[in-house]
UniProtKB/Swiss-Prot annotation:
Keyword Cytoplasm: yes
Subunit-level organization: UreD, UreF and UreG form a complex that acts as a GTP-hydrolysis-dependent molecular chaperone, activating the urease apoprotein by helping to assemble the nickel containing metallocenter of UreC. The UreE protein probably delivers the nickel.
Keyword Chaperone found: yes
Localisation: Cytoplasm
Organism encoding this protein: Brucella anthropi (strain ATCC 49188 / DSM 6882 / CCUG 24695 / JCM 21032 / LMG 3331 / NBRC 15819 / NCTC 12168 / Alc 37)
Pfam families linked: UreF
A GO cellular-component term linked to this record: cytoplasm
Protein name according to UniProt: Urease accessory protein UreF 1
Domain of life: Bacteria
Segment forming the signal sequence: none
Gene: ureF1
InterPro entries membership: UreF (IPR002639), UreF_sf (IPR038277)
Function statement: Required for maturation of urease via the functional incorporation of the urease nickel metallocenter.
Chief subcellular location: cytoplasm
Family: Belongs to the UreF family.
Amino acid sequence: MNIITTTTTDTTTALLRLMAWLSPVFPVGSFSYSHGLERAVHDGYVADTATMSDWLRWLVTRGSGWNDAVLCAESWRRAVAKGDLVEVAELAEALAGSRERHMETMLQGEAFLAAARSWPSSVFDRLPADCPYPVAVGAVAGANKVSLGLTLAAFLQAFCINLLQASIRLSVMGQNGVTATMSDLEPVLAETATRIEKTSLSDLGSATYISDIMAMKHETQHSRLFRT
């Protein structure tokens, strides 16, 4: 009997690499960052499953999650086309709106590149030593021939999963709430990833001011679980 499958060996390998790079156990220290969520919980903006779902939805479609994914896509394209990755890295760093957001993206980017060198590629020579996280992910994925669509969908999901893990530690919700939220956000993530495939740097923009302010206020928060 012949078994027909639509997954090729190359696609499977690419998917395995992507899952490894964006896994919570990949050594980038993502567990120590809440992206301002800790302050949002402290100030009452996020208090339960519904408000957490809304918070993520806005970040992914109108906020920092959107911008990071646009930067990831641009880096992917430049890695494939042998374009200027330093330029997009400098832009991504400049877009970090506060000290802790800057720390979060730069330290994770540095750690990602160090760990991803287990998959040798010439793209590392084209990236700056100080590289924002979404630029690092996009460039490495592009250089390893992982499809842009898969890269963006996985990147957005990893962004949400990290904050959902933080929400458990902050006692916003339990594991059932997390799985319900991921199911609820699935079409949003898929649609947003598809939209971002067609974007350029001119599509960068954010309207999630409260999230940005929470990231700034967290800098002076005395009692904390997270670095950001």
